[in-house]
């Protein structure tokens, strides 16, 4: 599915009545999220649906798809956890987190906390502006931009898939200061450091394959890293406004030491987040939608073509995904109720098999791993590497 999950673990059990009130208040500030996906003759489209966001007991499998005729967000509760599951059709991680953040602030207020004025929502109508639901891709689209260069196919993990439902999930908690210190020693950000660990572990798995298996596998290791474009192009949109960079190493050039990977990833990510190169990416995404012959293709044919393109031009080009929720900013009165956050990306497809989400809050950073295979070798090696760097790792039970 294209459903991702944001989870907040509170220090105390969730109070259902205050939470329901908070969700009802928050949805007034996000009316553009109260929509369902509809099928037209040429395109899918979003249509307003006058329903309230469901607050349900968290007992079913993670990131399951939304049924037809339903809203594309659900709120799930269990013990001391609140989870928001959202379809990527509706928004990206930043947009979904803004909604969850609003719920948490209102929840803490309902529980008796006094919220600073700058975080208060006294008038939902004044909070909603056209910029909140603008199509920012179209706003920053430029014509006559040269196309992106097609990338070669990448290495994929060799593990066998489980039978359905195959998606399992586990996470680990790491002291934020320790991982930050390790990254600072290398002169890079936490994201660059973790992407480098990801590539280093993939390299080790590749090198441990037997000769014939290694011969058959692609030698490009490449990680897809989503980028919040609001940090590059000014926008307050709550709709999707993210693209990705794909740092890589090429094992045809030989074995990479970890420091070599860090250096390479740092410079590749700097280059690929340059505004001009991001414009090429936006041009590719938006430009195809504007072509008359594309607009005139019936939806059933578009869906067939996109499904084929998804594998040939999509997941075949990268080996894994690492998405970092970024800095989490909350008023102290709300933050005091919270232990930590967990970010779970959409379940990986049959080709990718594993994905990784990162969330840092207060003194804790969580690493979550989604897995659709029989093996946990990747997660074990990833966390073992961090432990070898003297970074304490507290592993949580998988589900």
Give residue spans per PLM region.
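Histidine-centered acyl-transfer/condensation active-site motif
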Residues: 67-109, 120-130, 359-378
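Acyl-thioester-dependent acyl-group transfer interface
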Residues: 1-39, 49-74, 171, 204-399
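Hydrophobic/aromatic-lined pockets within catalytic cores
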Residues: 91, 104-111, 184, 198-210, ...
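Short amphipathic alpha-helical segments
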Residues: 190-199
